[in-house]
């Protein structure tokens, strides 16, 4: 399939929500979709407190992973910063998705289920409420399944303030 090909999801797969083209992509395109996050979230940037990141803080990003066996999350420091949470504090998936606006949460859950079922990466812009600062912000969530054999066991990706 060419890299510019788009997947069309049925209403039953999207929960009736219309996803713009490009939200779902094949796993072989993962390096292209993750490149920005790896550039912006180097070990040096992630180790710095947000105030020391400077202008990069406006476009700060974080890495995330969700183990599908128990829904446990692993976040980099940048992911905590985006949500306005203390770095390293315990966070459950249920607590994390509570930060999403209702509309964004519904779209994320539908696209996440599709990505797991079809073994495809995804990109989605969502609105969240950052805890410490109390403001709403838009975040681009880029994710892809991690497979062991034919089974998807984890999702991992990048969150980027947009």
Which positions does each model-derived feature cover?
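PAS-family sensory domains
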Residues: 2-30, 34-36, 80-156
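Sensory coupling linkers of modular signal transduction proteins
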Residues: 38-41, 51, 149-162
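PAS-family sensory domain signal
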Residues: 40-99, 138
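Hydrophobic pocket-lining residues within nucleotide cofactor-binding pockets
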Residues: 68, 146, 162
């Amino acid at each position: 399939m060419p890299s510019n090909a788009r997947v069309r999801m049925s209403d039953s797969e999207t929960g009736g929500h219309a996803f713009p083209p490009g939200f779902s992509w094949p796993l072989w395109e993962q390096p292209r979709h993750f490149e920005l996050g790896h550039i912006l979230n180097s070990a040096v940037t992630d180790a710095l407190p947000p105030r020391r990141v400077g202008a990069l803080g406006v476009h700060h990003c974080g890495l995330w992973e969700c183990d599908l066996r128990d829904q446990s999350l692993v976040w980099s420091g940048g992911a905590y910063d985006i949500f306005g949470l203390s770095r390293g504090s315990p966070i459950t998936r249920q607590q994390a998705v509570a930060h999403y606006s209702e509309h964004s949460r519904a779209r994320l859950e539908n696209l996440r289920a599709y990505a797991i079922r079809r073994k495809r990466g995804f990109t989605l812009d969502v609105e969240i409420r950052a805890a410490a600062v109390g403001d709403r912000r838009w975040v681009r969530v880029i994710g892809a399944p991690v497979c062991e054999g034919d089974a998807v066991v984890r999702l991992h990706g990048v969150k980027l303030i947009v």
